[in-house]
Amino acid sequence: MTISSDLILKGSILIREIEKTFLDLFSKGKLNGTVHTCIGQEYIGALLPKIINYDDVVFSNHRGHGHYIGKTDDVEGLLLEVMGSESGAVGGVGGSQHLYNKKGFFSNGILTGMSAVAAGYAFAIKNEKKIVTYFLGDGGLGEGILYEALNLISK
């Protein structure tokens, strides 16, 4: 597989600019709820479409904007969602952290909150030619559910 560094750089810059826009809108009180950006982690989201297939599934965390863009390429849906618009990715009710896309993207604002769901999904499709990707941060490593999920999928 050849991965174009130019495309990854462009994707990283796009994600960074979107995140900066969210921070600006948040500071002006134009967003409902909170916003957790992935600034400093943009490369991961930009690289994602190069390392997974269309049918693969992504479970993300509270800093999942870059993952969302990388998996779905739905920049407009993300922007509208975080701004609370009914035209957003999940009708304006999910906000920054609770995102979904029928292309196979799920996120949750609770640290390691998707670990058991991702493990169950992976178990359910274990005979298919798909990959389940799960993103977590180090802050979730103290949560018991993560280790239970890892035990389930290690069998």
Predicted feature residues:
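Cofactor-/ligand-binding subdomain signature composed of acidic, glycine-rich
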Residues: 1-32, 54
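Cofactor-binding active-site loop characterized by glycine-rich and histidine/acidic residues
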Residues: 20-23, 30-155
